[in-house]
Curated annotation (Swiss-Prot):
Glycosylation sites recorded in the entry for this protein: N192, N206, N212
Biased composition (Low complexity): 418-435
Species this protein is from: Homo sapiens (Human)
Full protein name: G-protein coupled receptor 39
Gene expressing this chain: GPR39
Impact reported for H17A: Decreases activation by Zn(2+). Abolishes activation by Zn(2+)
Subunit structure: Interacts with HTR1A. Interacts with GALR1.
Recorded GO MF terms: G protein-coupled receptor activity; metal ion binding
Amino acid sequence: MASPSLPGSDCSQIIDHSHVPEFEVATWIKITLILVYLIIFVMGLLGNSATIRVTQVLQKKGYLQKEVTDHMVSLACSDILVFLIGMPMEFYSIIWNPLTTSSYTLSCKLHTFLFEACSYATLLHVLTLSFERYIAICHPFRYKAVSGPCQVKLLIGFVWVTSALVALPLLFAMGTEYPLVNVPSHRGLTCNRSSTRHHEQPETSNMSICTNLSSRWTVFQSSIFGAFVVYLVVLLSVAFMCWNMMQVLMKSQKGSLAGGTRPPQLRKSESEESRTARRQTIIFLRLIVVTLAVCWMPNQIRRIMAAAKPKHDWTRSYFRAYMILLPFSETFFYLSSVINPLLYTVSSQQFRRVFVQVLCCRLSLQHANHEKRLRVHAHSTTDSARFVQRPLLFASRRQSSARRTEKIFLSTFQSEAEPQSKSQSLSLESLEPNSGAKPANSAAENGFQEHEV
């Protein structure tokens, strides 16, 4: 009969009422987190607010499509809401003063629901934005079906509705409660089921925390595990799409398409600007996957630990690991909302230049057609000057060749074109359904390119 000894050995390591005050972290951790959270809060609000302004400027100046602008603005708004809703309340109720009374149940429910919804809105925005770029790069003939204004609005609406549905169970499962209350439907350790050590709460009134309610344990578990499945699906889907986009970009850079032989008009040598745009896009794609994995995974692990078994069954080592992971997971999670503007600036020299101009309140960006008008005027002046020296046949051939030359790149993020840059051949962007109807200045000239990640 070895089984009776197991509960006794387990119960000797189980936390009890004396461990409840340890849900409040040490003072030096609080002070450190104040400084870290303050820096992250300012950087997050400033960076995402500037991102909204930058995308609006780039769209107005003809450097960025409206559909991509809508995706990026909605993503930045969800990040801002994560900071405004999540960080102040979470720092106060979880880090600074976690022990409270049961009168804060409503605020606990609302905060948890809104924070969860905004967090998963950010996650799903990364998915839809990656999907839109995946179709544009890997399946250009189908791009028009997902790139229209109505389709983009539907995708953004899908993101927010799905995020609210993912967070909805927490509205019922969360509240303020003494953390060691037994879960009625949970088959825990024998000592906890037979003993009254967890049934009797201390007489102190401020020993409740914002946590899952014992009467809604099954709902809480289903919500956390379901949200984790959503995270894994998004992570694997984004990784799959980014890997395929990188393959297409690298193969096109080497002179061959993924599905067959490259068309004759795509075999010409490409400029250094186009190759740089591809390298920047590949770096951007890799950083997206790394950010989702590194910044979100610690917080997901902590949530899984909270849902794996009720707190009255936690061992001391389990409880200690949870409390150590808590500040790190929260910090990395908020960093994920700060990184998005940094990814844009890293992968685009044009975005970085306008971003600095917005922060300095000194916008000097010209319209995308400005440089082209100057080049067209310069070419027409040169052609007029040389017309008297060359036969008409050569002049007409030169003008016809100039009209056929386009500058189209693969990356959404595009650097400014130089007047003396060599003419480039068509890329995968020319295969996009709506590219043929657009003038060269919208997709070919300065600024953000058609294929953004």
